[in-house]
């Protein structure tokens, strides 16, 4: 059961990382696909160049939150709901705590680089 929880949280971290805030902010608020303008990159720098700072700031903040959430929040969830009987308890400062942070953070980065919602590109 404990490995299943870790796998589910890692998949959730990947899915959170796959959310392209630049793409969605551009579509929702400006009606454009940011990947068709500027450097054709769905990133906050391209949003800044094409749409300006009023759109780039929320895109950047959303990108920071989507990397922070899996690394810190998921480890706090593990500590809150998992018991030492499950073998996944990660006390702050322990080796497991940092390994889970690295795992979930790396999955969010992989999701950011290869987003499933944008066809892995």
Positions of predicted regions on the chain:
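Cytosolic, membrane-interface loops and tails of multi-pass inner-membrane proteins
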Residues: 23-56
